Amino acid sequence: MKELMFDEKIMELELAGRTLKVSTGKISRQSSGAIVIQYGDTVLLSTANRSKEARKGADFFPLTVDYIEKFYSSGKFPGGFNKREGRPSTNATLVARLIDRPIRPMFPDGFNYDVHIVNTVLSYDEINIPDYLGVIGSSLALMISDIPFLGPVASVIVGYKNGEFILNPSPKELEESELDLIVAGTKEAVNMVEAGAKELDEETMLKAIMFAHENIKKICEFQEEFSKLYGKENIEFEKPEVLTLVKDFIDTNGYERLQQAVLTTGKKNREDAVDSLEEELMEKFIQENYPDVPEEELPEDIILEFKTYYHDLMKKLVREAILYHKHRVDGRTTTEIRPLDAQINVLPIPHGSALFTRGETQSLAITTLGTKEDEQLIDDLEKEYYKKFYLHYNFPPYSVGEVGRMGSPGRRELGHGSLAERALSYVIPTEEEFPYTIRVVSEITESNGSSSQASICGGSLSLMSAGVPIKEHVAGIAMGLIKEGEEFTVLTDIMGLEDHLGDMDFKVAGTKSGITALQMDIKITGITEEIMRIALNQAHQARIQILELMNNTISKPAELKSNVPRIQQITIPKDKIAALIGPGGKNIKGIIEQTGATVDITDDGLVSVFAKDADTLEKTLKLVDSFVREVEYNEVYEGRVVSIMKFGAFMEILPGKEGLLHISEISPERVEKVEDVLSVGDVFKVRVISMEGGKISLSKKKV
């Protein structure tokens, strides 16, 4: 039997004091491109494949990026009954989006083959985070495949502590960092940014991005060297040319009218004007060029060509108006925010609510306060933990006046929710300051761009209306870009059409003190430091304006509503924990059964009591106190008769603590028989008159 020989190619790069190792030729040899990437003991397999034929008639690039977390990579078992990985976790979905975003703009125009990139985490050392490695692995897999790709693209993480930037920090280092930044880009420019920050200023953020880019350049050069040695020749593909017949007809009959249509006021009116003109021109085009051809026999490629060129012309007209005339379709200047409105307490029962409207984008944000039982369980590769604050974002079809299926959230909804949650998380109080679990839901009731940023503004207002002591308000704004050659215009507060037809979506959120979240996606191959600086400065000015409106609406946390669960925390001595819990949990279960409250006890003696109202809270705290209190001399207690003797009665004055009420201490008058005046179960107040020898003596007559 012949021994199988692998033609494995390996290359290494020193990066942040560790070795980045890439290899191909050993695993997944039937993929068009396959890379095993290792950093420390974290290992990913990145594969790139394409369909055999181009997708005809596609008006989008059919790219799919998957990121698969395998629990065996960190020596763990999956949860659930089947003990098998199921649908991707929220984190896996977000990482897949993160890899997709810098890769997508790097394919040549007109390339319409289906492309599938899969990143599988094979080993995770809990030090080297696999997220950004997926960008590097995906890029290199494409570089060595036969798929046309304008890369390479690389990515790094940057932390910031004590005035120093940290390259590719560990999760532990990120916990202590003022910044959690992922940047991706080419050798020439940055093309993706994702960040959370502890109110960092714009200049420091920009320096962090450029620090990241310096290291990205090295990784891109490394990829180029590897792909030159081991890459395949790219396939040839034909970029479709616009038919002269279609182009000439639309330019002659529709150019000036389309210029007017795109300037129609209002999203719905503008869409109707553009669509009705397209229908009119299409009908005329068919009558002039295919007068005798039945509708069902019209050439599909001609109809598609017509629609494509019409859309491209609309895009060109909108972009030129902004770039050369600084004229936006809704009449705003390039730095102007759409009309704003903010209201709180718009719903009667929810603990906190707000309605934030910016132009034709609207978020109805609702805050709910709960107990530790309401915390969200997160089970990822590193560890299992609970989140006390989380935000959910919903984008129903009615928000854009359409029909559609209502179901579980998709990638876009998860991504927008994650960004809004991250922006607000930096102002959420600690558990010691505010022991509630906090859930914010953003219902997008109208949308014309920047709905994630409306969710941040609405969420902040809703939190404050619920009484959450957030440090200060957080506002978000989305910046856009129109760029042709060296000419460019940065837009403040982009609406849907500007996002769709523009080159950049740069979302910036923060307080008046600094940035808490940042996300940048572009449709071109990269943007310069100058563009980012202008965008950050314009975003800062816009954020201050929005924060002023929000603070005028509500500037400090409101009082908790009466229907909010009541929570109080007390600390008991560690040696009293067992007494409170009782044998087999008897005591704590008894308290819960009597009151209906929830009682949580930590190993360090922190007792958290969650009750439906103030009376229940007070009753529960008294019961807790009764189990941990010590009997004190001369104190009065409410006791219960547990047994009767000839010489007196034994009474329980605290759980598990009994004393003797002697017959002579029952009443000022003489008592002949104890049972004549007392019965088992009687409850009354007694005073501790002696504690000699560990024996407790009680008196009823001295109360």
Swiss-Prot record:
Residues 565-624 form the KH domain. Its cofactor is Mg(2+). Mg(2+) binds at D499, D505. It catalyses: RNA(n+1) + phosphate = RNA(n) + a ribonucleoside 5'-diphosphate. Involved in mRNA degradation. Catalyzes the phosphorolysis of single-stranded polyribonucleotides processively in the 3'- to 5'-direction. PANTHER family: POLYRIBONUCLEOTIDE NUCLEOTIDYLTRANSFERASE, POLYRIBONUCLEOTIDE NUCLEOTIDYLTRANSFERASE 1, MITOCHONDRIAL. This is Polyribonucleotide nucleotidyltransferase.
